[in-house]
């Protein structure tokens, strides 16, 4: 049985960095880290500097990006991250 997933879009000021189905997202919230899974309650949260990690629904791979701050919006089966990306 497939794990519940949601659409994730990660956008920086320069370009779209990721768009796809994921089963989880963890983010460095400004008041502490938080996680999002399918059917999460709607919310908007500020994120600080740290690692944004997500697990792809199809491959099961966990990927991450270093972010310098931004905003996460969760609405009806979709999550949008607007973030400044920190160079490696």
Regions found by a protein language model. Name each.
Residues 1-5:
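Short, charged, intrinsically disordered terminal tails
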Residues 6-88:
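Compact, glycine-rich, soluble single-domain proteins
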């Amino acid at each position: 049985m497939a794990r519940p997933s949601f659409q994730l879009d990660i956008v920086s000021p320069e370009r779209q960095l990721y768009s796809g189905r994921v089963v989880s997202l963890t983010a460095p919230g400004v008041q502490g880290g938080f996680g999002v899974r399918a059917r999460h309650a709607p919310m908007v949260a500020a994120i600080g500097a740290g690692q944004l990690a997500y697990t792809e629904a199809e491959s099961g791979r966990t990927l991450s990006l270093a972010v310098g701050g931004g905003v996460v919006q969760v609405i009806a089966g979709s999550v949008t991250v607007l973030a400044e990306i920190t160079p490696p």
